[in-house]
A protein has these predicted regions:
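Outer-membrane beta-barrel translocator domains and adjoining extracellular loop/strand segments
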Residues: 1, 42-48, 55-56, 99-106, ...
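Signature of Gram-negative outer-membrane beta-barrel scaffolds
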Residues: 1-26, 50-51
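Extracellular loop and loop/strand-boundary signature of outer-membrane beta-barrel proteins
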Residues: 2-6, 58-63, 110-117, 175-181, ...
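Repeated loop/turn-to-beta-strand initiation elements of outer-membrane beta-barrel proteins
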Residues: 26-29, 83-87, 136-138, 200-205, ...
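Residue-level signature of outer-membrane beta-barrel architecture
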Residues: 19-23, 35, 67, 79, ...
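Outer-membrane beta-barrel signature, preferentially recognizing the C-terminal barrel domain
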Residues: 8, 25, 37-96, 106-133, ...
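C-terminal beta-signal and adjacent terminal beta-strands/loops
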Residues: 210-219, 240-292
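Gram-negative outer-membrane beta-barrel transporters
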Residues: 92-95, 113-215
Length: 292
């Protein structure tokens, strides 16, 4: 017989409010509220059991997983300058209902699954800057500095079961609070870069760096330690040369620092151990394009 059951039949209304107050001709104050959702992926909202040969683990779906609903509150000050220069400062607060997290299946570190927790909060501040170097050093032309950085505090209350397991798993000298960081939420983000654009010579050059702080990847339970994603320092180079006849040459280098992507088990008074380690290496690419 045909199965006509839908996985999610709930109708949703997602209101949003935006207020913009012009402080000066080139300065704005923005205040916003919105309700958004983060729905589980097909893999998460299923009964699938998927083997990952890289980590030697099984991902087990959860057919009962619920969407996350997020109340977003934002305030932002922004000032604009010549040639698209920008200085902006923001503060934001998010309240998450039924946040989806990835945790180990009870009494096993070979299986992990998505779970809903009750509530979580996220508070953060953000600085955004786009500045022409020429305004600081007149002898340097066509060079622009871009910077975006965030500092974030997240708080997730333990479920009753998780708190009991973590309490039972306490070691001598170890204490426990009633909350922890939200799984998947980095404590800081940094994206910065230099863009050189010489229109006379039809050359664009970019050097970009981004990194995020140590992030809870898989939630443990006290007996099995939490898994954290370690910071990955990504430095990339990009060069584009335009020629006559709609032709262009592109040269890219990805991961100039040759950093590794790693995740680690971290327990109390224990040396961290690898959960996953991947040497992505440096990637060089050269391309030539003709537009018709």
């Amino acid at each position: 017989a045909e199965n006509k059951k839908k996985t999610d039949e709930k109708e949703n209304l997602f209101p949003s409010l935006n207020f913009i107050y012009s402080l000066k001709e080139n300065q704005n104050l923005r205040i916003a509220y919105s309700l958004t959702t983060a729905r589980p992926s097909f893999k998460e909202a299923s009964i699938a059991e998927i083997y990952d040969p890289l980590s030697n683990l099984f991902f087990i779906g959860n057919i009962n997983i619920r969407p996350t609903y997020i109340d977003n509150f934002d305030i932002r000050y922004e000032a604009f300058g010549e040639k698209a220069q920008l200085l902006a400062f923001s503060a934001f607060y998010k309240n998450l209902t039924d946040p989806i997290e990835i945790g180990f299946v009870a009494a096993s570190t070979s299986n992990y699954t998505p779970l809903n927790l009750e509530n979580a909060t996220v508070f953060g501040v953000e600085l955004e800057l786009r500045r022409s170097i020429n305004s600081l050093f007149p002898s340097i032309r066509n060079l622009v500095l871009n910077f975006n950085g965030s500092y974030i505090i997240s708080d997730e209350k333990y479920s009753e079961d998780e708190f009991k397991l973590r309490t039972l798993g306490l070691r001598e000298g170890q204490t426990i609070s009633n909350s922890r960081p939200l799984q998947g939420q980095s404590p800081y983000l940094i994206n910065t870069g230099l863009d050189y654009n010489n229109q006379e010579k039809n050359v664009q050059i970019g050097l970009y760096f981004n990194v995020q702080g140590k992030t809870l990847e898989v939630v443990g339970d006290g007996f099995y330690p939490d898994v954290y994603t370690m910071p990955f320092n990504s430095l990339n180079f990009n060069l584009i040369k335009q020629f006559k006849g709609n032709r262009s040459l592109t040269f890219k280098i990805t991961n100039l620092l040759n950093d590794e992507r790693e995740s680690r088990f971290e327990g109390f008074n224990n040396e961290s151990q690898y959960f996953k380690l991947r040497n992505v290496g440096r990637l060089f690419s050269l391309g030539y394009a003709i537009r018709f």
